[in-house]
Amino acid sequence: MVSDDHQQCAQSKNVCVIGAGPSGLAAARELRKEGHRVVVLEQNHDVGGQWLYDPNTDQTEVHSSVYASLRLTSPREIMGYTDFPFVLKKGRDVRRFPGHKELWLYLKDFCQRFGLREMIRFNTRVEYVGMLDCGELIIGNDLIKWVVKSKEKKADKVVEEVFDAVVVATGHYSYPRLPSIKGMDKWKRKQMHSHIYRVPEPFRNEVVVVVGNSLSGQDISMELVEVAKEVHLSAKSPNISEGLSKVISKHNNLHLHPQIDCLREDGRVTFVDGCWVTADTILYCTGYSYSFPFLDTKGIVVVDDDRVGPLYEHTFPPSLAPSLSFVGIPRKLIGFPFFESQAKWIAQLLSGKRTLPSWDQMMQSVKEFYHSRDVAGIPKHNTHDIANFEYCDRYADQIGFPHLEEWRKGLCISALVNSDANLETYRDSWDDHELLQEALQSPHFTQLNAQAFD
């Protein structure tokens, strides 16, 4: 809702953004646009979040889940922010589905173009975020202030600051989710999550079991078959894509299995159909969990089986909004434009330009959303999997943000269909030329055409 009193109540707030990845950068820009004073705390040495590749996985904490050969699963045309398209650059990766480094460079370009770097404190880990004085919390109290404790990597001192608002933009690819398998704790050979997978060479001549049939699981399996003795892909469902079926038929050392039943101390991995293999390594491509170890909301915001809640529109805790908000929680959507719409809403709420519904209305909305997911049979851990263009458009309507362009939706669907049918080749061979031309002739690209090869 637009506030009638905006002219009288507009004000600048001190806002802390946690994370300088795609969602954090979007938040920082929109907050500053709205006149707020912004500090971004980033634990890495540069911007990019997950897209800042780190080949070193021997350290205690690994922040990036990107492996060396990773390429985008969506075409570059749909990946950019709405007013800063992901265009080709001379001397760089000009493929439609470029490698991870190109997206990281795009984020650096975005940061430079809008002067965001001056707001960011790098190599700074957030240790604690909590309410300054909880006292008797008033529902919807916009006077809540937040204590943020942070520590620079090479410093001994913890810095304590107070902010009017905190935006959590830490992403959802940092905390590996592992399955619960009988005998897992006694299986003495190598077990690892794809979070720390980087290159296939360490698996040369090994028998590897890959758990999880996601795109990352499939990509890593296709990479491993070139060096491993055998690769056994364990999937929840026997119904696999045409593309994966083609890959399996092509490689004699790639085998499909159902879920794992148990692991045995002698190295055997037994599947639910009774088949078994003796493996050297189990590689879990089983996704990630939401985790905010620094955040203390006195139990108001909790993570329950990967459901972060209660959150109104996946963004606002009704009891703490707008002083606490989250950007980048939803999955399975076209991320960059959605991050922007979230960031704009947050920034305008904090300046008084807009208002949220009442606490009762927000909580009712959350309950209705949970109920709709339950009725549809969607597990709780998939609460934030959106996969719905209409939802993104309805969200945008809340702040007058443009709907996703039809070409953007079409290119997204086309890539999904093509990857399903042609898993090995979809990034380099496609038939969406008409949609591509529509995209390149749209204002999204033509408005910055002159800068395409800066």
Where in the sequence are the language-model features?
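Glycine-rich FAD pyrophosphate-binding loop
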Residues: 16-18, 32-59, 227-241
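N-terminal Rossmann-like FAD-binding beta1-loop-alpha1 element of flavoenzymes
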Residues: 5-40, 217-224
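Glycine-rich dinucleotide-binding loop and its adjacent helix/turn
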Residues: 4, 86-89, 99-106, 112, ...
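C-terminal, flexible cofactor-proximal segment of oxidoreductases
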Residues: 311, 323-454
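Rossmann-like dinucleotide/flavin-binding elements
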Residues: 18, 32-33, 196-238, 294, ...
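Feature captures the FAD/FMN-dependent oxidoreductase FAD-binding
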Residues: 93-165, 170, 174
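Glycine-rich active-site loop/strand segments that organize a redox cofactor
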Residues: 43-109, 133, 314-319, 352, ...
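A Rossmann-like FAD-binding core segment of flavoenzymes
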Residues: 128, 145, 161, 222-307, ...
